[in-house]
Design a protein with these regions (language model features):
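Non-catalytic accessory segments flanking enzyme active sites
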Residues: 1, 9, 15-21, 25-119, ...
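Short substrate-entry loop that stabilizes the transition state in hydrolases
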Residues: 118-168, 300-301
């Protein structure tokens, strides 16, 4: 709130927006961003008696940048941009927002980034990522480490599935409790849409997700095991029924609003119908990398361990199944910038090794 202006962070058509309302005239306007897949949000604005608004802009191709915007003149001034060592040129990359259609007719926004001219070479290696829980929306963001993957010919894509709030509260409600499977179906349908549009093909398609996003990965490989060349599940929540039945585990009782209370038969049966651990069977599972942290208090280490053990028991393919246990890490992975880079490097090495086959 400013003396003469009211500024709102909004979401419109799936994009984060900054709306400015002149309190004297009632007129409003939105900041315009010349990008196809971006994120914008308000920075720290301590002064009320000013016409200067500070905000941050980032996208799949542009690092986080802080601007001052004059709400009277409409002029933006760049104050600071994250420095990228090594001569990064965003013009060499391209980002785009596509709209896929889910099996029930709902729209699935998909944000993609890749090196320019890559699309001229036909279907490429593509890593599809999603989260899709708790109403958390993964907006398009810049990643320094991701450049390593893009420079090796990968396309990176974010499927904005239900369970997030990409289109507001309705998107969240349609991806939780007894609607949870919509998150998984959206992800699969987004993947098939990208194949249809020839961004990739089955032999080049990889998927990734962590925590509740790891649940998504565990579910989609049960539903469509042969759709993926490889899958990465980081600290995955995969034994849904057992965990939600044990209130002694941290967060369990608080999570009933998200997944349901399995002490109620309707919720128990529904959870059992998608819980990755309970649905493991003799299938041609893709190549897999599963990671966990020994000190993880949110998804205890034994949950991914027992899942991998059961997968190995039912494993029928010649594909690889790796488990990486971080003995000094928690739910967020290794602390420290360089140790975190090692985790990313491991995931990328797994993906790249599969492209050599």
């Amino acid at each position: 709130v400013f003396e003469n202006h009211l500024v709102l962070n909004e979401r419109k058509d799936g994009f984060s927006q900054i709306r400015i309302i002149n309190q004297e005239t009632g007129n409003d306007n939105y900041l315009e961003f010349n990008d196809n897949a971006y994120t914008s949000y308000l920075s720290i604005n301590k002064e009320m008696n000013t016409n200067i608004l500070r905000y941050v802009f980032t996208s799949l191709t542009k690092p986080p940048s802080t601007y001052d915007y004059n709400m009277d003149t409409g002029e933006s001034i760049l104050l600071k941009e994250q420095e990228i060592i090594g001569g990064y040129k965003f013009e060499q990359y391209e980002s785009i927002r596509l709209i896929g259609i889910a099996r029930d007719g709902e729209k699935i926004p998909i944000s993609l980034v890749y090196k320019k001219d890559l699309r001229k070479k036909g279907p490429q290696n593509l890593l599809l990522y999603a989260y899709g829980s708790y109403g958390s929306t993964i907006d398009p963001y810049f990643s320094l480490s991701r450049l390593s993957l893009l420079d090796r010919g990968f396309i990176f894509a974010i499927a904005h599935v239900r369970g997030s709030q990409i289109y507001g509260r309705r998107s969240y409600e349609e991806g939780k409790l007894l609607n949870k499977k919509n998150s998984f179906y959206d992800f699969i349908d987004a993947a098939k849409f990208l194949i249809k549009k020839q961004y990739t093909k089955k032999q080049n398609l990889f998927c990734s997700g962590g925590s509740a996003g790891g649940l998504l990965i565990g579910s989609v490989i049960n539903i469509e095991p042969t759709l993926w060349k490889g899958a990465i599940a980081a600290v995955p929540f995969v034994d849904v029924v057992t965990t939600m039945l044990d209130p002694s585990i941290p967060l369990t009782s608080n999570e009933w609003d998200e997944w349901g209370d399995p002490r109620i038969k309707e919720y128990y049966d529904y959870m059992l119908s998608y819980s990755p651990y309970d649905l493991v069977s003799n299938k041609e599972y893709p190549n897999m990398l599963v990671t966990s942290g020994f000190f993880d208090s949110q998804v205890q280490y034994w949950e991914p361990l027992k899942w991998v053990a059961k997968l190995r028991e039912y494993w029928t393919s010649k594909n690889r199944l790796y488990l990486k246990m971080n003995m000094d890490a928690g739910h967020g992975g290794q602390s420290g910038r360089f140790r975190r880079f090692r985790e990313t490097a491991l995931a990328y090495a797994f993906l790249i090794s599969l492209t050599k086959e």
